[in-house]
Amino acid sequence: LVDLHSGRRVSYSALNERASRFAEYMRDRWHVQAGDRIAVLAHSSTDYVEMLYGCAKLGAVMICLNWRLAVEELKGVLEDCKPAALVWGEEFDSAGLALSEAFELQGRMVTGAPRQGIAGYEAALAEMSGATIQMPWRREDEVWYMLYTAGTTGKPKGVLQTWGMAHVN
């Protein structure tokens, strides 16, 4: 896996380990279970892919937030999807902080340095054992992740992406 913007390269083995560490953190620290929703506000990166597969390992649904939306619009999305946790890229710190303060969440995380009550992504992964969490078999109709979309006339609406859709693609 290559992030052309940062130049970071991650092998599939490292991707699997880091996704397992993220899954372990969510399970052990935030008590995330299958079906829980994890909202992520970040640019595409290798970390983003790790989070996507970390959610998949637990059966959690990753909510891919559109970073182009204003904070008030993002609040509407979070009110709709009711996430258990919020992860944001440090470049979206003001929005991430505003959203994390507006909702009761089991977990909060930023891709930068940890701070009071907010985990840092790299520090969180380093705390975990690194033991592989196997990805269980998923039914075709199980939701893997969710996007929000809207035209010019209305609020963003959730679009579910199932495991079956992923296999067809």
What name fits each language-model region?
Residues K57-E127:
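Structural core segment of the AMP-binding/adenylate-forming
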Residues R9-S13, W144-V168:
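Conserved AMP-binding A3 loop
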Residues L15, A19, I38, C55, ...:
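Adenylate-forming
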Residues M128-Y148, K155:
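Conserved pre-ATP/AMP-binding loop-to-beta segment of ANL
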Residues S20-E24, E79, E91, G154:
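Solvent-exposed alpha-helix faces
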Residues L1-S11, V40, A113-Q116:
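AMP-dependent adenylate-forming
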Residues R8, Y25-E72:
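Conserved AMP-binding/adenylate-forming
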